Amino acid sequence: MVEKFIMAGDAALHVCDSEVGDKCVVLLHGYLENMLVWEDFVPLLYKDVRVVTLDIPGHGISVVNGEIHTMDYLADTIAAALDKIGVEHATIVGHSMGGYVALAFAERYAERLDGLVLLHSTPYADSDEKKKNRQREISLVKSGKKELLAHIAPEAGFAVENRNRFRTEIEDLQQTIYLTEDAGIVALLNGMIERKAQSEMLHALGKPILFILGRKDGYIVPEIADKMVAEHPEADVVWLENSGHMGFIEEPKTCAAALLDFVRG
């Protein structure tokens, strides 16, 4: 993987690119993560496809731009980044929040989309309760209590029975949160609060779609996951039987195989 720092529109972006492969897969990380979350997953892919990872603006070492990073703004930034590195078409894979960005990309740049993968993510807008929870997180960060997020969020991402086995990965994710700019966390929370529902867009997209879901996901509970699958017969679905919200870490080989099968068509 070749590390790059590029200007994508008005955003200074940190990118890694394997640079080789007829087909390209772009991996978009989730909230409170950065591109390093894919570090052990990428080697399962790059012998078969070109792989691009990046720090979404507001996380990692990509620059924060204002008090809100809307999903549309982030999608435009991704498109500009792909222009810079010479990628015309790609399969966009979005983990959790990255899935919301991927959906916005699909809506705005469908002609550049080979396929869309929602990895532990949904096309639904935030419920009122979820919006209130995000507002509480904003208040925590602004009051200097980010460590509370670090204490809770990473561990909650893993299935209960996997937490001891992935203790090192959980601690790495906690460290990532400590190193993430407060302003970036707030900008992305504001963007997620404002995002719209994308189910109708998915129905009309006319591109290959894959949902990868964890049976033991504490963030996307079974009722929501089942509802999403039932409402979107246009999507292929892969269930990770032993994963929570972090299937590319909890069941990496199964996750990678599903993704590569999808990309190959």
Where is each model-derived feature located?
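Conserved HGGG/HGGXW glycine-rich cap/lid loop of the alpha/beta-hydrolase fold
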Residues: 11-67, 71
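Short beta-strand/loop motif that positions the catalytic acidic residue
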Residues: 205, 211-213, 217
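Alpha/beta-hydrolase fold catalytic core
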Residues: 1-25, 46-50, 83, 87-88, ...
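Conserved alpha/beta-hydrolase catalytic His-Asp/Glu region
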Residues: 126-132, 144-204
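Gly/Ala-rich beta-loop-alpha elbow adjacent to hydrolase catalytic centers
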Residues: 94, 98, 102
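Flexible "cap/lid" loop of the alpha/beta hydrolase fold
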Residues: 103-108, 113-148
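Conserved acidic catalytic loop of the alpha/beta-hydrolase fold
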Residues: 73-90
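Catalytic histidine-centered segment of alpha/beta-hydrolase-like enzymes
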Residues: 243-252, 256
